[in-house]
Protein backbone atom coordinates (compact mmCIF):
# COMPACT_ATOMS: atom_id res chain seq x y z
CA UNK A 1 0.00 0.00 0.00
CA UNK A 2 0.96 3.64 -0.36
CA UNK A 3 2.40 5.46 2.63
CA UNK A 4 0.09 6.59 5.41
CA UNK A 5 -1.18 10.17 5.65
CA UNK A 6 -0.30 11.56 9.11
CA UNK A 7 -2.43 14.70 8.64
CA UNK A 8 -5.53 12.67 7.80
CA UNK A 9 -4.83 10.28 10.69
CA UNK A 10 -4.51 13.15 13.18
CA UNK A 11 -7.95 14.60 12.34
CA UNK A 12 -9.40 12.38 15.08
CA UNK A 13 -6.32 12.14 17.26
CA UNK A 14 -8.15 12.58 20.57
CA UNK A 15 -10.47 9.67 19.78
CA UNK A 16 -7.60 7.50 18.52
CA UNK A 17 -5.43 8.28 21.55
CA UNK A 18 -8.07 7.44 24.15
CA UNK A 19 -7.60 3.63 23.80
CA UNK A 20 -3.83 4.18 23.99
CA UNK A 21 -4.34 5.98 27.31
CA UNK A 22 -6.60 3.20 28.56
CA UNK A 23 -4.04 0.56 27.61
CA UNK A 24 -1.27 2.48 29.36
CA UNK A 25 -3.42 2.87 32.48
CA UNK A 26 -3.65 -0.93 32.81
CA UNK A 27 0.11 -1.48 32.74
CA UNK A 28 1.13 -2.49 36.29
CA UNK A 29 3.24 -0.13 38.36
CA UNK A 30 6.76 -0.65 37.11
CA UNK A 31 9.83 1.29 36.01
CA UNK A 32 10.82 -0.15 32.63
CA UNK A 33 14.26 0.72 31.32
CA UNK A 34 13.74 -0.38 27.71
CA UNK A 35 10.45 0.27 25.87
CA UNK A 36 9.44 -0.33 22.26
CA UNK A 37 6.32 1.26 20.76
CA UNK A 38 5.39 -0.98 17.83
CA UNK A 39 3.45 0.78 15.09
CA UNK A 40 4.01 4.15 16.73
CA UNK A 41 2.34 6.11 13.90
CA UNK A 42 2.67 9.90 14.31
CA UNK A 43 3.94 9.50 17.87
CA UNK A 44 0.75 10.07 19.87
CA UNK A 45 1.21 6.80 21.77
CA UNK A 46 4.98 7.32 22.05
CA UNK A 47 4.32 10.67 23.68
CA UNK A 48 2.14 9.01 26.33
CA UNK A 49 4.88 6.49 27.06
CA UNK A 50 7.52 9.23 27.23
CA UNK A 51 5.42 11.23 29.69
CA UNK A 52 4.88 8.26 32.00
CA UNK A 53 8.41 6.82 31.73
CA UNK A 54 10.66 9.84 31.03
CA UNK A 55 13.88 8.04 32.00
CA UNK A 56 13.36 4.93 29.88
CA UNK A 57 15.16 4.08 26.65
CA UNK A 58 12.15 4.50 24.37
CA UNK A 59 12.04 3.60 20.69
CA UNK A 60 9.13 4.02 18.27
CA UNK A 61 8.96 1.54 15.39
CA UNK A 62 6.85 1.93 12.25
CA UNK A 63 7.07 0.97 8.58
CA UNK A 64 5.71 4.33 7.40
CA UNK A 65 8.34 6.95 6.66
CA UNK A 66 5.72 9.71 6.68
CA UNK A 67 4.42 8.67 10.09
CA UNK A 68 7.95 8.47 11.50
CA UNK A 69 8.78 11.95 10.22
CA UNK A 70 5.68 13.28 11.95
CA UNK A 71 6.59 11.42 15.15
CA UNK A 72 10.15 12.75 15.10
CA UNK A 73 8.88 16.31 14.72
CA UNK A 74 6.58 15.79 17.69
CA UNK A 75 9.26 14.15 19.87
CA UNK A 76 12.69 15.30 18.66
CA UNK A 77 14.47 13.73 21.65
CA UNK A 78 13.04 10.23 21.07
CA UNK A 79 14.48 7.52 18.83
CA UNK A 80 12.43 6.18 15.91
CA UNK A 81 13.17 3.28 13.60
CA UNK A 82 11.69 2.39 10.22
CA UNK A 83 11.11 -1.37 10.36
CA UNK A 84 8.59 -4.14 9.77
CA UNK A 85 7.30 -5.45 13.09
CA UNK A 86 7.48 -9.01 11.75
CA UNK A 87 11.24 -8.71 11.24
CA UNK A 88 11.94 -6.46 14.23
CA UNK A 89 14.44 -7.83 16.71
CA UNK A 90 15.62 -5.59 19.55
CA UNK A 91 19.29 -5.53 20.49
CA UNK A 92 18.34 -6.24 24.12
CA UNK A 93 15.29 -7.82 25.79
CA UNK A 94 12.55 -5.26 26.35
CA UNK A 95 10.88 -4.38 29.64
CA UNK A 96 7.75 -3.13 27.85
CA UNK A 97 6.54 -3.86 24.33
CA UNK A 98 3.57 -1.61 23.61
CA UNK A 99 1.45 -1.94 20.45
CA UNK A 100 -1.56 0.33 20.10
CA UNK A 101 -3.78 -0.27 17.04
CA UNK A 102 -1.01 -1.79 14.92
CA UNK A 103 -0.91 -5.58 15.18
CA UNK A 104 -4.35 -6.02 13.58
CA UNK A 105 -2.68 -5.19 10.24
CA UNK A 106 -0.38 -8.21 10.56
CA UNK A 107 -1.33 -11.81 9.85
CA UNK A 108 -0.38 -15.06 11.58
CA UNK A 109 -0.90 -13.97 15.17
CA UNK A 110 -0.34 -17.59 16.20
CA UNK A 111 3.35 -16.99 15.42
CA UNK A 112 3.59 -13.24 15.99
CA UNK A 113 2.42 -13.04 19.60
CA UNK A 114 4.73 -15.76 20.99
CA UNK A 115 7.58 -14.15 19.03
CA UNK A 116 6.94 -10.72 20.52
CA UNK A 117 6.59 -12.25 23.97
CA UNK A 118 9.97 -13.92 23.54
CA UNK A 119 11.57 -10.48 23.10
CA UNK A 120 10.66 -9.49 26.67
CA UNK A 121 13.04 -9.41 29.59
CA UNK A 122 12.13 -11.41 32.69
CA UNK A 123 8.98 -9.88 34.20
CA UNK A 124 8.57 -7.72 31.07
CA UNK A 125 5.15 -6.66 29.79
CA UNK A 126 3.46 -7.01 26.41
CA UNK A 127 0.63 -4.47 26.09
CA UNK A 128 -1.58 -4.63 22.99
CA UNK A 129 -4.73 -2.89 21.79
CA UNK A 130 -6.38 -3.89 18.50
CA UNK A 131 -9.57 -2.74 16.79
CA UNK A 132 -12.04 -5.62 16.63
CA UNK A 133 -14.51 -4.03 14.26
CA UNK A 134 -14.53 -6.04 11.03
CA UNK A 135 -18.11 -7.12 11.74
CA UNK A 136 -19.31 -3.59 12.48
CA UNK A 137 -21.54 -1.78 9.92
CA UNK A 138 -18.62 0.52 9.06
CA UNK A 139 -16.51 -2.38 7.80
CA UNK A 140 -19.28 -4.56 6.41
CA UNK A 141 -20.17 -1.58 4.22
CA UNK A 142 -16.64 -1.48 2.80
CA UNK A 143 -16.92 -5.07 1.62
CA UNK A 144 -20.46 -4.54 0.33
CA UNK A 145 -19.47 -1.57 -1.83
CA UNK A 146 -16.36 -3.41 -3.07
CA UNK A 147 -18.47 -6.36 -4.22
CA UNK A 148 -21.09 -4.28 -6.04
CA UNK A 149 -19.45 -1.85 -8.40
CA UNK A 150 -17.27 -1.51 -11.49
CA UNK A 151 -14.25 -1.95 -9.19
CA UNK A 152 -15.24 -5.50 -8.17
CA UNK A 153 -12.33 -7.21 -9.95
CA UNK A 154 -9.79 -4.63 -8.82
CA UNK A 155 -10.80 -4.97 -5.18
CA UNK A 156 -11.06 -8.74 -4.91
CA UNK A 157 -8.18 -8.88 -2.42
CA UNK A 158 -8.88 -5.64 -0.54
CA UNK A 159 -11.06 -7.25 2.10
CA UNK A 160 -8.37 -9.72 3.15
CA UNK A 161 -5.58 -7.20 3.72
CA UNK A 162 -6.57 -7.14 7.38
CA UNK A 163 -7.52 -10.43 9.03
CA UNK A 164 -10.01 -10.79 11.85
CA UNK A 165 -8.30 -10.81 15.23
CA UNK A 166 -8.28 -14.05 17.21
CA UNK A 167 -10.60 -14.70 20.13
CA UNK A 168 -9.67 -13.82 23.70
CA UNK A 169 -9.42 -17.55 24.45
CA UNK A 170 -6.92 -18.04 21.63
CA UNK A 171 -4.70 -15.15 22.72
CA UNK A 172 -4.80 -16.41 26.29
CA UNK A 173 -3.66 -19.88 25.24
CA UNK A 174 -0.85 -18.40 23.11
CA UNK A 175 0.57 -16.37 25.99
CA UNK A 176 -0.35 -18.16 29.22
CA UNK A 177 2.29 -20.94 29.01
CA UNK A 178 5.02 -18.28 29.06
CA UNK A 179 3.36 -15.69 31.29
CA UNK A 180 3.10 -14.80 34.94
CA UNK A 181 -0.23 -13.13 34.23
CA UNK A 182 -2.49 -12.49 31.21
CA UNK A 183 -5.22 -9.84 31.35
CA UNK A 184 -7.63 -9.59 28.40
CA UNK A 185 -10.68 -7.39 27.99
CA UNK A 186 -12.84 -5.91 25.26
CA UNK A 187 -14.26 -2.39 25.23
CA UNK A 188 -16.70 -0.77 22.82
CA UNK A 189 -16.22 2.98 22.47
CA UNK A 190 -19.17 5.03 21.25
CA UNK A 191 -17.79 8.10 19.48
CA UNK A 192 -20.28 10.93 18.83
CA UNK A 193 -19.47 12.00 15.28
CA UNK A 194 -20.78 15.26 13.80
CA UNK A 195 -21.98 13.63 10.56
CA UNK A 196 -21.92 10.52 8.41
CA UNK A 197 -19.19 12.21 6.38
CA UNK A 198 -17.06 12.47 9.53
CA UNK A 199 -17.30 8.69 9.97
CA UNK A 200 -16.11 8.25 6.38
CA UNK A 201 -13.25 10.71 6.97
CA UNK A 202 -12.17 8.80 10.09
CA UNK A 203 -12.04 5.52 8.15
CA UNK A 204 -10.33 7.00 5.08
CA UNK A 205 -7.18 7.22 7.21
CA UNK A 206 -7.26 3.55 8.21
CA UNK A 207 -9.79 0.87 7.29
CA UNK A 208 -10.71 2.23 3.86
CA UNK A 209 -7.10 2.44 2.64
CA UNK A 210 -6.94 -1.06 1.07
CA UNK A 211 -10.16 -0.33 -0.83
CA UNK A 212 -9.28 3.16 -2.06
CA UNK A 213 -5.62 2.90 -3.01
CA UNK A 214 -6.02 0.47 -5.95
CA UNK A 215 -8.63 2.75 -7.59
CA UNK A 216 -8.21 5.61 -10.02
CA UNK A 217 -9.28 8.98 -8.63
CA UNK A 218 -12.68 9.01 -10.37
CA UNK A 219 -13.55 5.52 -9.16
CA UNK A 220 -12.31 6.40 -5.69
CA UNK A 221 -14.78 9.27 -5.48
CA UNK A 222 -17.62 7.04 -6.68
CA UNK A 223 -16.67 4.37 -4.15
CA UNK A 224 -16.69 6.92 -1.33
CA UNK A 225 -20.09 8.25 -2.40
CA UNK A 226 -21.61 4.75 -2.39
CA UNK A 227 -19.97 4.07 0.96
CA UNK A 228 -21.28 7.32 2.44
CA UNK A 229 -24.83 6.39 1.40
CA UNK A 230 -24.63 3.13 3.36
CA UNK A 231 -22.96 4.77 6.37
CA UNK A 232 -25.65 7.46 6.45
CA UNK A 233 -28.31 4.75 6.81
CA UNK A 234 -26.30 2.52 9.17
CA UNK A 235 -25.58 5.28 11.69
CA UNK A 236 -28.79 7.31 12.15
CA UNK A 237 -28.82 10.74 13.73
CA UNK A 238 -29.17 11.02 17.49
CA UNK A 239 -31.39 13.60 19.14
CA UNK A 240 -28.62 16.23 18.81
CA UNK A 241 -27.88 15.40 15.16
CA UNK A 242 -24.69 13.46 15.84
CA UNK A 243 -23.99 9.84 14.83
CA UNK A 244 -22.71 7.28 17.34
CA UNK A 245 -19.82 5.28 15.89
CA UNK A 246 -19.47 2.04 17.84
CA UNK A 247 -15.83 0.94 17.89
CA UNK A 248 -14.96 -2.34 19.68
CA UNK A 249 -11.35 -2.88 20.72
CA UNK A 250 -9.52 -5.84 22.24
CA UNK A 251 -6.90 -5.24 24.95
CA UNK A 252 -4.17 -7.60 26.17
CA UNK A 253 -1.66 -6.99 28.96
CA UNK A 254 0.60 -9.96 29.68
CA UNK A 255 3.57 -10.19 32.03
CA UNK A 256 6.46 -12.55 31.29
CA UNK A 257 7.72 -15.05 33.83
CA UNK A 258 10.27 -13.79 36.35
UniProtKB/Swiss-Prot annotation:
One of its GO terms (molecular function) is trans-aconitate 2-methyltransferase activity. It catalyses: trans-aconitate + S-adenosyl-L-methionine = (E)-3-(methoxycarbonyl)pent-2-enedioate + S-adenosyl-L-homocysteine. Its EC number is 2.1.1.144. Its main location: cytoplasm. The keyword Methyltransferase applies. Transmembrane segments: none annotated. One of its GO terms (biological process) is methylation. It is found in: Cytoplasm. Keywords: Cytoplasm, Methyltransferase, S-adenosyl-L-methionine, Transferase. One of its GO terms (cellular component) is cytoplasm. It is an enzyme of class 2 (transferase). Pfam families: Methyltransf_25. Belongs to the methyltransferase superfamily. Tam family. Catalyzes the S-adenosylmethionine monomethyl esterification of trans-aconitate. This is Trans-aconitate 2-methyltransferase. It comes from Yersinia enterocolitica serotype O:8 / biotype 1B (strain NCTC 13174 / 8081). The lineage of its organism: Bacteria, Pseudomonadati, Pseudomonadota, Gammaproteobacteria, Enterobacterales. The gene is tam.
